[in-house]
UniProtKB/Swiss-Prot annotation:
It comes from Arabidopsis thaliana. One of its GO terms (molecular function) is single-stranded telomeric DNA binding. Keywords: Chromosome, DNA-binding, Nucleus, Telomere. The lineage of its organism: Eukaryota, Viridiplantae, Streptophyta, Embryophyta, Tracheophyta. This is Protection of telomeres protein 1c. Disruption phenotype: No visible phenotype under normal growth conditions. CDD domains: hPOT1_OB1_like (cd04497).
């Protein structure tokens, strides 16, 4: 049986940009989305620029890869929030700039529309509590 790998704890973007060649989990607001395009290997790539309260400018560029166009993040508004787990921080432009890669093999993401609110992101347990603006009772989201 395969061993379950724990996701890295949730961190802020300003801390993530210092962790080159490491996998991180973070949450941010989508500031910009470039048009998805097909790669030479027939996978798809979508480039997002995200921000959080610690890194509002210029934001972090995240390249999201998937096998199909439909598996890419479907951003509706530029205030949507996105949670990434196990994205790899990397440098480019001779080490002057940092971006992140969301691999289709090890990374994942969860997208929250702008009217949803993050109530709490627990730094010790990687738990995220989201409110959708309704009076619905809380629901547990478990990972297997």
């Amino acid at each position: 049986m395969a061993k379950k790998r724990d996701s890295p704890k949730l961190i802020k973007i300003k801390d993530a940009i210092k962790l080159i060649n490491q996998e991180v989990s973070l949450i941010g607001i989508v500031l910009e989305q470039r048009e998805p395009k097909q790669c030479r290997n027939n996978d798809w790539i979508c480039t997002l620029r995200i921000i959080d309260d610690t890194y509002p400018s210029p934001g972090l560029t995240v390249n999201v890869y998937s096998r199909t166009l439909e598996q890419l993040p479907q951003i509706k508004n530029h205030d949507d929030m996105i949670l990434f787990t196990r994205i790899k921080m990397q440098t480019f432009d001779s080490g002057k700039r940092v971006n992140a890669a969301c691999s289709r093999w090890v990374s994942s993401f969860a997208l929250f529309e702008g009217e949803d609110l993050i109530l709490h992101a627990d730094e010790d347990t990687s738990a995220v509590f989201v409110w959708d603006g309704t009076d619905a009772p809380p629901a547990s989201i478990l990972a297997k």
